[in-house]
A protein has these predicted regions:
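Ordered, amphipathic secondary-structure segments that act as subunit-interaction surfaces
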Residues: 76-89, 94
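Helix-start/capping segments and mature chain N-termini
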Residues: 1-73, 93-171
Length: 171
């Protein structure tokens, strides 16, 4: 199932314009919720975190009832998997679109290895949640995280374990 705002569309219609600021600036926020027996796990906590991310990224007037209804609609159609929600900036600061979709469960290998990778850009717990700093928001700007994962895979590991400069596991 694919929803743009509250409109159900086909997979082919579930597209993102290249002019969208999320495409060329990474200007967006997201949440991913695990589905357990047709219900999204931790729904209210995810909505609260999404609200915090939107506040930090200056996404105003987001209809969180629409977001919640989309999550419930998608999860009610699947016994397991994930619901992904992206709130992405369009061509101007005041315009955004809410994308919601189902993702099947990820297939994890039987053996899983992690390589520690430094993540100096990542929140290390040394910030105030209510600060205006975007640290601590679930931003779609994941290039740094992906780069560290690629490094770990190239070194023969399954994934990266992101740590801060004190060795504390971040992600």
């Amino acid at each position: 199932m694919y929803l743009i705002n509250d409109l159900e569309v086909t997979k082919d219609e579930f597209t993102l314009p290249v002019e969208n600021l999320a495409v060329w600036r990474g200007d967006g926020v997201f949440e991913a919720l695990k589905i357990h027996d047709h219900y999204p796990f931790g729904l209210e906590k995810h909505i609260d975190r999404l609200k915090q991310s939107c506040k930090k990224q200056l996404f105003d007037n987001v209809d969180f009832n629409l977001v919640k209804n989309n999550i419930l609609k998608i999860s009610s159609n699947h016994k397991s998997g994930y619901v992904r929600v992206l709130i992405l900036r369009n061509e101007s600061d005041d315009d955004f679109t809410i994308y919601s979709f189902y993702q099947p469960l990820l297939n994890l290998p039987e053996e899983f290895t992690l390589q520690s990778q430094p993540a100096p850009w990542h929140a290390g717990g040394d910030y105030e949640v209510d600060s205006k700093n975007i640290v601590g928001s679930k931003s779609t700007s994941y290039a740094y995280n992906i780069k560290q994962t690629r490094e770990a895979v190239r070194d023969g590991f399954t994934d990266a374990l992101l740590i801060n400069n004190k060795g504390i596991v971040l992600e």
